[in-house]
């Protein structure tokens, strides 16, 4: 048994990654997060992420790894865990194509040998946009995630087009980053 405090929307995923292998080795059949006051407050941010499912770049060919389940139990409900609790889980799966593109630009280098080497500059162009209300605000403001990088890449592209480097520059603005780095995973697998 290990106690931990979850105090941010990303920490359930971090804690799972940190302790999942140890739990497997110890023969765990599941992981139960018992919230504290701080992680209770993050539930409104965490719940949509827990419901969104798994995205893969290979579509129907994607192998979804079977894993031990993870449950989130609010502290006030932890008495339910005493004795011999049982739970029934109904799992639904669906497959669909997620529309997305990678935007790629190249400025060829000036050096006859070095132009075959590439400097990769990248970011992503998607954003979640709207979420469940948090303090009556439903907008995910995306200036830094990731509009500022797109603007920076465009500015660098303009600068390099006027004064090319010795090496070629590859500009990639990935799609579907918010769905699990799909655009960058696709580009890495299919350069």
List PLM regions with ranges.
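Extracellular/luminal Protease-associated
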Residues: 1-60
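Short, solvent-exposed loop/turn and secondary-structure capping segments
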Residues: 2-6, 41-46, 115-118, 130-135, ...
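Short alpha-helical segments and helix-capping/turn motifs at coil-helix boundaries
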Residues: 13-21, 25-26, 90, 101-107, ...
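Acidic/histidine-rich catalytic neighborhood of metal-dependent amide-processing enzymes
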Residues: 15, 99-102, 129, 135-191
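Sec-exported extracytoplasmic/periplasmic mature domains
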Residues: 24-29, 33-36, 83, 155-165, ...
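Generic beta-strand/beta-sheet core signal
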Residues: 34, 122-124, 172-175
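Soluble metallo-hydrolase cores and metallopeptidase-like ectodomains found primarily
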Residues: 56-142, 158, 162, 166
């Amino acid at each position: 048994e290990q106690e931990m405090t979850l105090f941010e929307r990303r920490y359930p995923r971090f804690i799972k990654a940190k302790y999942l292998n140890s739990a497997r080795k110890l023969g765990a059949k599941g992981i139960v997060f018992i919230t504290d006051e701080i992680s209770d407050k993050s539930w409104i941010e965490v719940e949509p992420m827990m419901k969104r499912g798994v995205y893969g770049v290979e579509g129907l060919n994607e192998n979804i790894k079977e894993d031990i389940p993870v449950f989130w139990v609010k502290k006030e409900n932890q008495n339910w865990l005493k004795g011999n609790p049982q739970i029934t889980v109904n799992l639904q799966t669906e497959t669909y194509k997620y529309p997305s593109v990678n935007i790629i630009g190249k400025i060829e280098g000036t050096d006859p040998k070095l132009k075959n080497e590439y400097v990769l500059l990248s970011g992503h162009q998607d954003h979640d946009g709207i979420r469940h209300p948090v303090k009556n605000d439903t907008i995910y403001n995306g200036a830094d995630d990731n509009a500022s990088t797109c603007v920076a890449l465009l500015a660098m592209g303009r600068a390099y087009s006027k004064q090319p480097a010795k090496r070629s520059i590859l500009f990639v603005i990935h799609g579907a980053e918010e769905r699990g780095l799909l655009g960058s995973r696709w580009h890495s697998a299919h350069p």
